[in-house]
Amino acid sequence: MSMKPLGGSMASAEPEGDIADPGSLDPELLGFMCGIEIHQQLATGKLHSRQSGMLYDYTIDTIPEDWPRAQRRLRASEGEAGKIDVAARFEAKRNRSFIYVKSPNAGLIELDEAPPLSHDSDAVDISLTVVAMMGMNPVPVMQAMRKTVVDGSNTSGFQRTTLIATGGQVETPSGVVRISLLTLEEDSARKLDTQSNSDGEVVIYTLDRLGVPLIEIATEPDIKNPEHAKECSRALGQILRDTRKVRRG
């Protein structure tokens, strides 16, 4: 059986250059293949509740003691296919419980005690603006999907994600990078601390960040080298900043 380079781009099976000096190696001759995925918080209200998207800069030592707290355990259950997710089963065996600190911008939806509301209209508008800036194709219907999250950072046990558009591209000095998809999803709760007691491990989260909208952008593996990856990241970041409606640290 013979081995051929992918796409015929590699001249030989051995790297050309000094392997002790990675900077001297040609990424394309090595068969370098790269795509990137980025997440950007939006400066809006929460995605599926009408709560404020304000973030509180508290630590486990400074968070107000009078903020309500709820303690939960996540239980692995069967999905639509009638099977229990392997990661969920593993997490259940860790015997961890979770304490959620209810910030002023957290309500019944953040506590998973009420059904989610429709998408925040401002978050959708910003997403569609970015879609237009990259020449993407919006989907005809927005349908929230559920991604299993078993580390306790989502009170419901899953993250709501909505596909907004596919296709499109971004221009860089080293060439065009195709965009695979853009989704709109919820950020997770913020972890404050992990403690141990006689009953096992207790993880403490605050709910201020849970539900804040995130734009997720994924590219195709068109990036040619590390410098090209930097250019692509910068181009995507500039597009998002040009909306004037994203959060910046």
Spans of model-derived segments:
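Basic, nucleic-acid-interacting segments
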Residues: S2-G249
